[in-house]
């Protein structure tokens, strides 16, 4: 499945705009506290363990969005947006959304 942040796909014609699709992932209540604990883990200015948690959450949300698009008969998603939010009790939410299309 093609997934892009742009409104179209170069060299492809969108033949049907199907629906808005989304996916969310919420990571454990200790993620913010763990961020500060992982300061020891900083190498070259990057917090490796925190980045891996962000990637894991983003991958889960993206997979959920792709599966929903597939169920609706789409073979691509355009205009995707990825948002990161710290919600109550220090939980991290990653939300992705886009438009499911058929090319």
Curated annotation (Swiss-Prot):
The record's listing under Pfam families reads: YbjQ_1
Which protein, by its recorded name, is this? UPF0145 protein BT9727_3206
Q: So what family is this one in? A: Belongs to the UPF0145 family.
Q: Which domain of life is it from?
A: Bacteria
Coiled-coil annotated spans: none
Species per Swiss-Prot/TrEMBL record: Bacillus thuringiensis subsp. konkukian (strain 97-27)
InterPro entries registered for this protein in UniProt: UPF0145_dom_sf (IPR035439), UPF0145_YbjQ-like (IPR002765)
Concerning NCBIfam families, the annotation shows:
PRK12855.1, PRK12856.1
């Amino acid at each position: 499945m093609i997934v892009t942040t742009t409104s179209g796909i170069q060299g492809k014609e969108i033949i049907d705009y199907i629906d808005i699709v989304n996916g969310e992932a919420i990571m454990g209540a200790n993620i913010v506290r763990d961020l500060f604990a992982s300061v020891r883990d900083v190498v070259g200015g990057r917090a490796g363990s925190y980045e891996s948690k962000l990637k894991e959450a983003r991958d889960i949300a993206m997979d959920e969005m792709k599966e929903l698009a597939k169920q609706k008969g789409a073979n691509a998603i355009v205009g995707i947006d990825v948002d990161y939010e710290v919600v109550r009790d220090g939980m991290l939410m990653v939300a992705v959304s886009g438009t499911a299309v058929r090319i």
